[in-house]
Design a protein with these regions (language model features):
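Short Pro-Cys-Gly-centered "Cys-loop" motif that presents a nucleophilic cysteine in a tight turn
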Residues: 1-47, 52, 61-188
């Protein structure tokens, strides 16, 4: 997919055969360091992210045509090489290339961010989204300062971090969930 400047995309992928892509906390931290290291070289903005044991989700805005694919390829080639070396394994780590879905209805952007931030709760990994440290939910609600976060984007919709927290804690209406399905990973 050719990523177009000014558009928002849900980027995701999962491990081969739904296997874990992170074997330790250090693996999560390594990937986040790589993202922060490489991000300044690319014209894109991270809106929301969530790293899960078997998959990842990014909500990204392309600031320049074609900026997302080279970035994703670079960080995950680097990550896969490091992971394979650490785990004494070889071969592919992911189910093919990253998937990308354009968010053509911008009114759903915050619902998608909420969906991503609730992923660890739905998976039974935590009781509250703020307990999962491998997403930027804590930035959204003011518990952590981070660089993979667009504060202006959040303030466009929510006056305070507490408003976003309440939005996330409210159940996603079924009608909204049905509409979000076209933007989501199959069998999440």
């Amino acid at each position: 997919m050719k990523h177009i400047a000014g558009q928002y995309y849900h980027i995701y992928n999962r491990g081969v055969e739904k296997r874990n892509i992170f074997a330790s906390d250090e693996n999560y931290r390594f990937l986040l360091r790589r993202i922060k290291e490489f991000l300044p070289e690319y014209s894109l903005t991270f809106i929301a992210y969530c790293l899960m044991p078997t998959h990842y989700h990014f909500l990204i805005r392309a600031e320049e045509d074609g900026s997302i694919s080279p970035f994703i390829q670079r960080i995950f080639n680097s990550y896969t090489q490091a992971f394979n070396k650490q785990q004494n394994r070889s071969g592919t780590l992911f189910e093919g290339r990253a998937k990308s879905k354009i968010i053509d209805e911008t009114s759903y952007l915050f619902h998608i961010a909420r969906y991503l931030h609730l992923n660890p709760v739905r998976a039974g990994l935590t009781l509250k989204p703020e307990d999962w440290i491998y997403s930027n939910y804590r930035e959204f609600i003011g518990l952590r300062k981070g660089t993979l976060y667009d504060a202006a984007f959040v303030r466009e919709q929510f006056e305070t971090p507490e408003e976003y927290r309440k939005f996330v804690e409210d159940e996603i209406p079924n009608e909204i969930m049905r509409r979000l399905e076209k933007y989501m990973l199959d069998d999440d």
